[in-house]
Amino acid sequence: MEKDAPLAATGTPSLMAQAKEMMEGYTLRARKGLGQHFLISQGVLNKILLAADLKPTDTVIEVGPGLGVLTEELIKRAGQVIAVELDDKLVTALTEKFKAYPNFRIIHSDILKTSPAEILGQNIPYKLVANLPYYITSAVLRQFLEAEAKPELMVVMVQKEVAKNMVAQTGDMGLLTLSVRFYGNPSLVSVVPGGAFYPPPEVDSAIVKVAIPQAAIMQGVSEADFFKLARAGFGTRRKTLLNALAQGLGVSKQSVLALLNRAGIEPARRAETLSMEEWKMLCLVYTENPC
């Protein structure tokens, strides 16, 4: 993991100048309600592109393209780029800015109301590369990870604390960790300071890469049962698994004790201490014989 050196509020002059020119030309402003912080660091941009490992045959979905700094580089490298943007003024500006590129398309829509299948229009492999607005990060991650048409790779900019949860190891894992690791293999690319954006956010961000294999990581595990158990286990984090599962599942402690014994898990442990393999075993045992 790398951390960029702190940047001045102006960031990289060339990208900052481009941002100001575009904002003035189209009478744009960063809308706080939409969590808009525009990327102005060439170094951070390069790290995103390196992690995305784009090829001329790739299809890329970008959520919240902002002023198009990342979009422009995606267009140069990928075969097709589909951006999804809610801000109508940005849609107008980006449509004009990239009108000469036949491999670019922008959809004016709320990403949370638009499925990956609807965006793509066909069943093809794709990558998600995006600087995600903080306020919808978890919802967007769930939407793409749980979709029937999952990306083969996700490279996303998220709040630093969210990134830490996404890549957490056994002992520190939470529900978000399990949600990501159920489908893919996450890794932290780089921590990004607030000065890499305009206007700068109050917290640091981070780039996270999630590789999603074609073959399911949790082969043979019921998705519904897995997340039912996970939500119950993490519903009351300070409680032991015995108490948390009994309360979360609405069953007796005796039933949960029998379940944990069959899975070979100590009832006094807490949810965050379980490894992915232990969650898998717990789920398999539960599916075979529910409490």
Curated annotation (Swiss-Prot):
InterPro entries: KsgA/Erm, rRNA_Ade_diMease-like_C, rRNA_Ade_Mease_Trfase_CS, rRNA_Ade_methylase_Trfase_N, rRNA_adenine_dimethylase, SAM-dependent_MTases_sf. It is found in: Cytoplasm. It is an enzyme of class 2 (transferase). GO terms for cellular component: cytosol. PROSITE patterns: RRNA_A_DIMETH, SAM_RNA_A_N6_MT. Signal peptide: none annotated. S-adenosyl-L-methionine binds at H37, L39, G64, E85, D110, N131. It catalyses: adenosine(1518)/adenosine(1519) in 16S rRNA + 4 S-adenosyl-L-methionine = N(6)-dimethyladenosine(1518)/N(6)-dimethyladenosine(1519) in 16S rRNA + 4 S-adenosyl-L-homocysteine + 4 H(+). Its EC number is 2.1.1.182. GO terms for molecular function: 16S rRNA (adenine(1518)-N(6)/adenine(1519)-N(6))-dimethyltransferase activity; RNA binding. Specifically dimethylates two adjacent adenosines (A1518 and A1519) in the loop of a conserved hairpin near the 3'-end of 16S rRNA in the 30S particle. May play a critical role in biogenesis of 30S subunits. Belongs to the class I-like SAM-binding methyltransferase superfamily. rRNA adenine N(6)-methyltransferase family. RsmA subfamily. HAMAP family: 16SrRNA_methyltr_A. This is Ribosomal RNA small subunit methyltransferase A. It comes from Dehalococcoides mccartyi (strain ATCC BAA-2266 / KCTC 15142 / 195).
